[in-house]
A protein has these predicted regions:
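Intrinsically disordered, low-complexity Ser/Thr/Pro/Gly-rich regulatory segments
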Residues: 1-240
Length: 240
């Protein structure tokens, strides 16, 4: 699996135990206790289970309101897929910090640096893989869309860095292929869909977010181009 270091636990399994356990085993135990179907989910798991505001007064912040509406939409969408035996994990506000190599043009050399940020939403699907969503409350695509795309670039950088540090080469290639086919989406629930000539291919607009059915139509359309993920890689991503 991830091959992460051994950690000190709060107790000993038996008198012969030194109190240490490997990270993979402890993570799997936690997931088994809290999400019994995590290897092949048949239910939708919201993580955290309720929307957590980023501000003390979420009613005063339009960004929080918009994220909350999309959180609710994803939850209802996920629940609707359970009838088809299709489960998933939907993670909100996941902070990441990964080390990446970056080319310094002035000094003409590779340098190591941190990429930090927050995934607005990450959807982990046992067949379609990982999908990043960045949510913007703006009523127009001007500036905010390109800003969200930069955030999605960081989302993808963080996952590639995680894969490079923790996964074998074969799985790293699968991660890269998955991100190439499904690089992430900008969600703008308050912005009407632009005309066909101006509409970005990775945009989700007001018309797509009005009902569970409209979002399901968008999903059915876009998910056709997503790469099927294998179970071992899915398990690694859930454990992340």
């Amino acid at each position: 699996m991830l091959g992460l270091p051994r950690v000190k636990t709060c107790g000993q399994e038996d008198l012969n135990s030194d109190g240490f356990a490997d990270w993979d085993s402890e993570t799997e135990k936690f997931l088994s206790r809290n999400y019994g179907d995590f290897i092949c989910p048949t239910k939708t798991h919201m993580v955290p289970p309720v929307f957590e505001s980023k501000h003390r007064r979420s009613d005063a912040d339009n960004g929080d309101k918009t994220e909350k509406s999309f959180f609710d939409l994803l939850q209802k969408f996920g629940e609707s897929r359970e009838q088809l035996g299709e489960g998933m994990f939907i993670v909100h506000s996941y902070n990441f910090k990964e080390m990446i190599s970056d080319w310094n043009e002035k000094q003409t050399k590779l340098e190591m640096k941190w990429v930090l940020g927050e995934h607005d939403f990450v959807l982990l699907h046992p067949i379609k893989g990982i999908v990043f969503f960045q949510v913007k409350a703006s009523c127009t695509t001007k500036e905010k869309f390109s800003e969200a795309n930069k955030q999605i670039d960081k989302d993808m950088q963080s996952l590639r860095a995680f894969a490079a540090a923790n996964l074998p080469k074969a799985m790293q290639k699968k991660v890269n292929k998955m991100l190439y086919c499904c690089p992430g989406f900008v969600v703008m629930p308050n912005c009407p869909r632009p005309n066909s000539q101006q509409m970005p291919s990775n945009g989700i607009f007001k018309e797509d977010c009005e009902t569970v059915e409209s979002f399901a139509n968008w999903w059915n359309w876009k998910s056709n181009g997503m790469v099927k993920i294998d179970q071992e890689l899915f398990k690694c991503l859930v454990m992340r």
